[in-house]
């Protein structure tokens, strides 16, 4: 069964929240990430995703709709971008269990859950590449988040590398 994420052009984005209020522009931000091939511009777009949807460990409802897209966007990208995307999804999953985080609306739940549950498989795709400590920290947390061990994933993300 194929689970479709929220369409990037759906009016539903207006009903979701990001750090600055309505998430009506998030579909366009994600569409730009799908389409843009310029590395510098992609870096700015990724910054926009983090800054609007999961800044400082806080999560907003539009992040739940964005997560399946983020996984799809990064699927065929280079190693660093794939790790960054897995980090974002892991942070969203960890943050949604914090006090005050918004719940996941029913219409977003299946696509979101499917994306989160795919984290361990996405990490396994990167097994043949050498990981530095920070990458191992992020990818270890991603496996834990995908296995619904959000408290352990949070601890791993919060633990300083080299401590």
What are these regions (language model features)?
Residues 1-12, 17, 93-163:
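Long, helix-rich interaction regions
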Residues 4-6, 38-50:
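HEAT-repeat alpha-solenoid elements in large eukaryotic scaffold proteins
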Residues 66-67, 76-90:
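Helix-rich alpha-solenoid scaffolding regions
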Residues 23-32, 65-73, 118-122:
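Alpha-helical solenoid scaffolds in eukaryotic proteins
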Residues 44-49, 85, 135-140:
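Conserved hydrophobic register position within alpha-solenoid helical repeats
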Residues 37-38, 77-79, 131-133:
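Short inter-helical turns and helix N-cap capping residues of alpha-solenoid HEAT/ARM repeat scaffolds
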Residues 49-53, 88-96:
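Hydrophobic residues within the alpha-helices of tandem HEAT/HEAT-like
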């Amino acid at each position: 069964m194929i689970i479709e994420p929220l369409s990037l052009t759906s009016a539903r984005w207006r009903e979701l929240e990001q750090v600055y209020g309505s998430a009506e522009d998030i579909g366009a931000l994600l569409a730009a990430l799908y389409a843009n091939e310029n590395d510098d511009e992609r870096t700015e777009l990724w910054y926009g995703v983090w800054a609007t949807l999961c800044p400082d460990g806080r999560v907003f409802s539009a992040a739940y709709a964005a997560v399946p897209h983020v996984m799809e966007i990064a699927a065929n990208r280079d190693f660093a971008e794939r790790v960054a995307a897995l980090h974002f999804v892991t942070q969203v999953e960890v943050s949604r269990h914090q006090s005050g985080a918004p719940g996941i609306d029913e219409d977003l739940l299946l696509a979101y859950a499917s994306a989160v549950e795919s984290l361990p498989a996405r990490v396994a795709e990167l097994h043949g590449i050498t990981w530095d400590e920070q990458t191992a920290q992020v990818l270890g947390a991603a496996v834990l988040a995908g296995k619904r061990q959000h408290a352990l994933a949070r601890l791993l993300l919060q633990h300083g590398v080299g401590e």
